[in-house]
Design a protein with these regions (language model features):
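Sec/Tat signal peptide C-region and signal peptidase I cleavage site
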Residues: 23-25
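Eukaryotic scaffold repeat domains enriched in small/polar residues
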Residues: 27-330
């Protein structure tokens, strides 16, 4: 019998309702806002069969992707082999996590500037840091108490200010501060110092400035500006590292699911959505779009995570298509 975590059906049902609503809007052509409707098509192409999987491996929902300093690509999925590593040419290196309860609520992975891998688990309410040797170096959050399942739909059911309630993503400031988008339950952003001490949190469920409805992804730019994918409100919110509100961007036709931000002096943000990827500058202008909804190669189905090691390369984790795509500029 397949073991299922009691928290996941609620999460997936909520995501399904959100995606169906967004898809209806996208297919009808209604709700196009701002410059997204006028943005050009990005000159990206799919690199077919880039990843060389072991013949016996079958992926589950592909929900995370990250690239380390060596150019190795890490794929996170909800199958029996939850974490896979490929080299820069797409050759399979290893798989990790088979049979581990740690990956029951796998949600996302990131590499910090020191090349440590951070894993976000929405079921255990934990964010786990692994060092370069793959050893657990730090854990933020804690497993929920049994009574939490009985109060799952109650706002603020987790009273500990440093605890999470279905966290979704992580990013880091230049001073080592850690920011967690938290998430399906708490609808806030939590800040920790470089030693892992809780500093502050901001936001609650709502649609006002600084409020969130499922903050699903978070990144920071070279100017130390934070960008939060406020998925349930179909918008992007912008803050400084103290949580002060700066801007809100409403110029995408669908909800933002995932972010990556390119390195280098001229940064851009790639945004994954239901069946499309958007490219934005740091002022929020939509520079281009790519893709349309579908499950055949070249289309996209729930872009749950994106990674962009440079401006001309995007890796897209498609949750419902159960695959990871490599896209490159033509």
């Amino acid at each position: 019998m397949t073991k299922r975590h009691p928290i996941l059906p609620f999460v997936f049902a909520a995501a399904l309702a959100l995606a169906n609503s967004a898809l209806t809007t996208a297919q009808s052509g209604a709700g196009m806002q701002g410059d997204a409707a006028m943005a050009p098509q990005l000159p990206l192409r799919l690199v077919e069969n880039f990843f060389h999987y072991p013949a016996t491996y079958v992926m589950g929902e592909v929900i995370g992707v990250a690239v380390n300093s060596k150019g190795h690509v890490f794929l996170l999925n909800r199958g029996y082999h939850p974490l896979l590593e490929f080299d820069a040419e797409g050759a399979f290196i290893r798989s990790m996590g088979e049979g581990s309860a740690m990956f029951e609520g796998a949600h996302s992975i990131r590499f910090d500037p020191q090349d440590n891998m951070w894993y976000i688990d929405a079921s255990s309410n934990m964010v786990i840091k692994f060092d370069l040797e793959g050893r657990t170096a730090e854990v933020l959050g804690m497993r929920p108490e049994p009574w939490t399942w009985l109060t799952h739909v109650i706002e603020h059911a987790v009273p500990n200010k440093s605890a999470f309630y279905q966290p979704t993503d992580v990013t880091w400031a230049a001073d080592g501060s850690v920011f967690i988008s938290d998430g399906y339950g708490n609808s806030r952003v939590a800040k920790f110092d470089k030693e892992g001490n809780f500093v502050k949190a901001w936001g609650e469920r709502g649609n006002g400035k600084g409020d969130f409805s499922t903050p699903h992804s978070i990144v920071i730019d070279k100017n130390q500006t934070l960008y939060v994918a406020d998925r349930g409100n179909s918008r992007i919110q912008v803050f400084d590292t103290d949580g002060n509100f700066k801007q809100v961007w409403n110029n995408l036709p669908g909800p933002p699911w995932s972010f990556c931000i390119t390195p280098g002096p001229t940064q851009v943000i790639y945004v994954g959505s239901v069946g499309k990827i958007y490219k934005l500058d740091l002022a929020g202008k939509v520079l281009g779009t790519f893709g349309h909804y579908g499950r055949t190669p070249g289309t996209m189905d729930w872009v749950h995570a994106v990674a962009c090691p440079d401006e001309k390369t995007v890796f897209a984790a498609e949750e419902q298509a159960w695959r990871l795509d490599k896209l490159v500029a033509q």
